[in-house]
Amino acid sequence: MRVIAGEAKGRTLVVPRSGGTRSATDRIRETLFAIVEPQLEGARVLDLFAGAGTLGIEALSRGAAHATFVERGAEAVKALRRNLETTKLAARSVVVSANVIAYLDSGPRDQRFDLVFCDPPFADVGIAEATLGHDGLRSAVARSGLIVARAHRKHLPAVPTFLDIARVKEIGEEKLLFLRYIDPTAGG
């Protein structure tokens, strides 16, 4: 797996040996970033369930100012840190080794993110729903911020009523949900 575009284009990314992560394919990343590209320059990115960091690293490579990666798996965090070093993007990032819900419970209150990736395990729709509905996420998203949730097309999470589904993109067995808060004062 490689970075597709930007300053780290072509750099190889490693994935955890133990498995347990499901990195976004080139096709998924190409589609996703074609849609969010206009918002990337100077953006602050939050990559939840980051795995090896493919989404956040791609965002940094394409011009995001900073990325915070949240991942609980030790092997995934190790691969993520290695990927940030390999791509020379570590200085513009923070890696939080934690459960996403625990991070949102305690975490990003003083930060506002322009772009959030929510890429939980497909088998756990409940964790996707808990994350999207979490007050900690709501307070961490900038007013014009965008949340991109990745899910299996047959197992979509219920989207909270305070989020607007701005766009849905189906790619093979997956769907990308592009979400914004309905009330612009709802986010930070």
Give the positions of each predicted feature:
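Class I S-adenosyl-L-methionine-dependent methyltransferase catalytic core
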Residues: 1-188
